[in-house]
């Protein structure tokens, strides 16, 4: 059984203390002589054996015998006093013999304490210089250290994500990105943290976690353009598409009200032209005109102008009136004589002009 340094020092000090306390008592007990127990003064056992031989065997006491007894009693008292003085001196010597070993034991403990301090300082220096044993590499990680490692891992992952977002697949912002040395350092820290946590068996590796860690390796080139597109806003500002108004009408095309107004103006002009054409210039012509079939539509148009204010009705009437005007013009040309046509050239030309206007403006109305 191996004892530590403290246990050895305590054992040695206990042995020295026991020896220092027990040895003086052993020596003092040897130096003392056993004294005979005191007896009564009347007995003859106190006297030396020589006195027994000198005593008379008779029961009677002589004056010489009494003197001898008194003399022996005085001598015994003196001897007893001398023995008491010697005993007092022995007790003083015994007290000094008990104090001196205790004082020596204290000195011995102080020497041991100094030696222990010196040996402890040397062992501490040796431990600092020596390398860590291989068993400490697989020591358990405390909860506080685990939380710190997880926080460092999260910070490293965030830094890597920011780095990847800055660089991008096209490499346009590489001048503003972090240098390659910092990238390598971050990757190294991430790998070290992951390795330490795996050795401590605090993380159970799963396919999902491996897939999450896979993009942060050195051979990863970034997300593809399909999943992480980059839009260039400058091109979008330069090439601005034309706005298309679906429900808004074309500005060049006339509205329904404008078409109705145009048709009303055309009808008014046509009615005025026809009224001038039907004036009686010659009796022969008046007869011919009276014989010729007359279209009742202009009369109805002049009378019922207020009734036909609807744009759709006006557009339909304009189409029918144009056809009627063309037929009436042809009929008048056939019935009139040649000279009248020559004389009234201005009127015929005006009628032709009116018909041409009707033919030209008719398609706009329908559009």
Swiss-Prot record:
Subcellular location: Endoplasmic reticulum membrane
Gene Ontology terms for molecular function: acetylcholine receptor binding; protein folding chaperone
N6-acetyllysine found at: 201
The keyword Transmembrane belongs to this UniProt entry's keyword annotation: yes
Chain segments annotated as transmembrane: 96-116
The protein's assembly and partners: Monomer and homodimer. Interacts with CHRNA7, CHRNA3, CHRNA4, CHRNB2, CHRNB4 and HTR3A.
GO biological process: positive regulation of cytosolic calcium ion concentration; positive regulation of protein localization to cell surface; protein-containing complex assembly; synaptic transmission, cholinergic
Family membership: Belongs to the ric-3 family.
Name the UniProt record assigns to this protein: Protein RIC-3
UniProt KW Transferase keyword: no
Functional summary from the UniProt entry: Molecular chaperone which promotes the proper subunit assembly and surface trafficking of alpha-7 (CHRNA7) nicotinic acetylcholine receptor. Promotes the proper subunit assembly and cell surface expression of alpha-8 (CHRNA8) nicotinic acetylcholine receptor. May also promote functional expression of homomeric serotoninergic 5-HT3 receptors, and of heteromeric acetylcholine receptors alpha-3/beta-2, alpha-3/beta-4, alpha-4/beta-2 and alpha-4/beta-4.
Organism this protein belongs to: Mus musculus
Signal peptide: 1-31
Membrane-related topology note: Single-pass membrane protein
Residues in cross-link Glycyl lysine isopeptide (Lys-Gly) (interchain with G-Cter in ubiquitin): 201
Region (Disordered): 30-67, 262-301, 322-367
Tissue-wise expression: Expressed in brain, with highest levels in hippocampus, cerebellum and superior colliculus.
PANTHER family recorded: PROTEIN RIC-3, RESISTANCE TO INHIBITORS OF CHOLINESTERASE PROTEIN 3 RIC3
Cited InterPro entries: Ric3 (IPR026160), RIC3_N (IPR032763)
GO CC aspect terms: endoplasmic reticulum; endoplasmic reticulum membrane; membrane; synapse
Coiled-coil boundaries: 138-169
Keywords: Acetylation, Chaperone, Coiled coil, Endoplasmic reticulum, Isopeptide bond, Membrane, Signal, Transmembrane, Transmembrane helix, Ubl conjugation
Domain comment as written in the entry: The coiled-coil domain mediates transient homodimerization with other acetylcholine receptor-bound RIC3 molecules, promoting stepwise ACHR homomeric assembly at the membrane.
